Amino acid sequence: MNGNTDGFKKELIITLKCFFGFEETLKEELKELGYPDAKILNRAVQIKGKWKDIYYLNLHSRCSISILVEIASFKIKTENDLYQEAAKMKWSSYFDVNKTFAVKGAIYSDVFKNTHYPYLLVKDAIVDHFRDVTGDRPDIEIKRPQVLIDLYVSNNQVTISVNTSGNPLFQRGYRIDAGEAPINEVVAASLIRMSGWDRKTTLMDPFCGSGTLLIEGALLATGIPSNIERQHYAFKNFKNFDEELWNSTYNSALRIVRSLPCKILGSDISDEMVLKSRRNLRGFSFGRFVEISAKPFNEATKPEGPVFILSNPPYGQRLELDEELYEEFGSWLKHEIKDGTACIISSSEEGLKSIGLKHSKKVKVYNGNLDCSFRIYSLFEGKRKEAIA
């Protein structure tokens, strides 16, 4: 590996962060990617590995928000202990003084009266180290730092990590246009995996918006990494960045050429949303095979044979809640879809009740900061007899 690697251990403790409710889903994804020994944490999954795994997972993990590498772990009793321990670290072995940085994370400790103060202490320790070693200091950049330090304090236990992803991994790089209330890309990928879709049955989203669920479904079905269009990764700013290894990892992903094994259909009542979906699909080889129509859900072309419906219907907080829409959608599912599965995410409890169908699975999840419910319904010829009035 090129550069100075003294700062990092040979065996890395790697933490992959995810949204609440998707820990088991991320663990299953890691097993499929060749990492069977993952440990579930709160909103995260942890494994051990090497830098080749960091490069591979940043590119291939669809369900991760960010990927951290632990660089220090210690206990503290006072606020000053945090500064003293952070000041002992050889920060200049991780990144150069000309790189911008920021310190973020989570603080759950009574040691600190002000939860912002720990970040300032670590920031000062980093700046003081560079000033002592180089005579210069790195600049702090809060919004788009080149190096992002993750600080996690739980009671007296401190863990300091580097965020190898930088910007969250739901910033895929493929979205040209977003809808009014878009579903997060990592949430979309996680829902698809949680839903149990077999990647062969026709996938349909009758409220497709800007097409995120359809695109993530097509990426999964074709095996193309969701982050293949993403350019920025924070690990490129570390001293030990191995460009040759990264290029090899990336080029291997580019060689994945698999035709779409199923039909993927989308519709939306908004002409503008349909146009946005088509724009977002343009950059992919499968883009022309994904069928998008500007129609309300009950006028969309129903596919022959089994269908897997995955959708994020309009709901409150960002869009006006329309219980009548949910009731009509439930009636359409009940009477028009004779063979299939419907998977619905919504933050509207009343809207979901209005669907009027018994769910086979219910999971609490988050779409960004929105508290949502994800429900799975089995649809078949006799479903109307089981409907809830």
What are these regions (language model features)?
Residues 2-145, 389:
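Non-catalytic nucleic-acid substrate-recognition regions in nucleic-acid-modifying enzymes
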Residues 52-59, 167-170, 383-385:
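Short, charged/polar, Gly/Pro-enriched secondary-structure boundary elements
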Residues 108-111, 168, 314-318:
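A short, flexible beta-alpha/helix-coil linker loop
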Residues 149-165, 375, 384:
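C-terminal edge-of-domain segments
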Residues 160-194:
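SAM-dependent Rossmann-like transferase core, predominantly class I methyltransferases
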Residues 183-302, 323:
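Conserved S-adenosyl-L-methionine
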Residues 295-389:
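C-terminal catalytic and target-recognition region of SAM-dependent MTase-like enzymes
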